[in-house]
């Protein structure tokens, strides 16, 4: 092993074995060329024959991986559908609740409006009743005043007649007394 202060030169063989090989990024130039850089003939490599070069174990692993992916996709799809269904159900429930609350609010508002209209009509009726009562009282007062005026006129006439009668009686009494005085003087 390398000392603590020194850097490790070269590749780590353990790490090299653990790395997975990606078939899309591999160049495989080392398989095609020999150590001097010359190309080897195509007949010696399976890569250029056009045949499937995978081993049966690799194919089985690929199939099991594909099955696992399909199974995961299926479970994800089921979960997604369940969540969509639950979300839709929750939305419908919320819409139904909102609709019911809206209906209740509408009913309450209608009741409030009808109550307000009734109260307004009652107030108008009370006002009309008060106006009618006031007008009746005013008529009665006017009748009372006209009757009083007539009575005052009659009383004034009676007073004038009484005063005239008193004056006539006084004149009569004065004449009678003056006649008696004159007879007594004679």
Swiss-Prot record:
Keywords per UniProt: Chromosome, Cytoplasm, Meiosis, Nucleus
UniProt feature coiled coil, ranges: none
Protein's recorded name: Protein FAM9B
Region (Disordered): 1-93
Tissue-specificity statement: Expressed in testis and ovary (at protein level).
Transmembrane portions of the chain: none
GO biological process: meiotic cell cycle; spermatid development
GO cellular component, one term: chromosome
Extent of Basic and acidic residues compositional bias: 10-27, 34-58
Record function comment: May play a role in meiosis.
First-listed, main subcellular location of the protein, grouped into a coarse class: nucleus
Matches recorded under Pfam families: Cor1
Family statement drawn from the similarity comment of this UniProt entry: Belongs to the XLR/SYCP3 family.
Biased composition (Basic residues): 66-93
Gene encoding the protein: FAM9B
Subcellular location, record wording: Nucleus; Cytoplasm; Chromosome
